[in-house]
Amino acid sequence: LTYSGLSVAAILIMGGFALFGKNLLNCLPILFGNWLYARWQRERWNKYIIIGLFSTCLAPFVSFLFVTLDTSFARRVLAAALIGALIGFVVPALAPHTASFHMGYNLFNVGFAAGFVAIALMSVLRGFQLDSGSVMIWQRGFPPLLTGLCLGGLALLFGWGWLLSDEEELRRLGRITRHSGRAVADFVFMDGVGPTFMNMAIMGLLAIGWLWLIGGDLNGPTLGGVITIMGFAAFGMHPKNCAPIVAG
């Protein structure tokens, strides 16, 4: 696995969604299915592991089956593991085809593919009268400690990027905003690690600032979204191409 903008995005989206919905147990079956797909294709796993990490966006299906099924513990574990392995196997097969739908203008291509899988799975589960009601567990406000930790972390990330950059690379920070962001837009490869880290910090600060400005809340889901934005600030996102969407 090479260090790239896409790998940074995959790792940060894993960390961000670990704040709401993902955990080790509901991700492992999906990664196992991803490994099985690599074996099926007779390829090395590192070719598909990034897709596997993104595929864990459907990890709640694993938890849902384990919690909801009215059967023995062993059968619930087996059903949850099988559905996770199925997800991990199917999404890598589907993702290359969904990329042609949007021609690189959707940076969340694996999530797009996973959406089709989720629709199919929910249709099947509802056919068996397995459905989940809406649940809202939401913390209000901007906790001072969490806000301080986030701002301190962003300052450290920006400073780290600055230290990693020479004079030429510092000029590339402005050049990042001239990229369209259309995939594949690997800022780590095109502009260097330092400018990419600084762009990630700027995007994180802007996201938190926007949440505060509109009276939003800083909690697991919103912080997960901020971390996801930071991850994709290494792979296509920058202030110039995100501002019009936020304004809309």
Predicted regions and their residues:
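Pore-lining transmembrane helices
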Residues: L1-N106, G111-G248
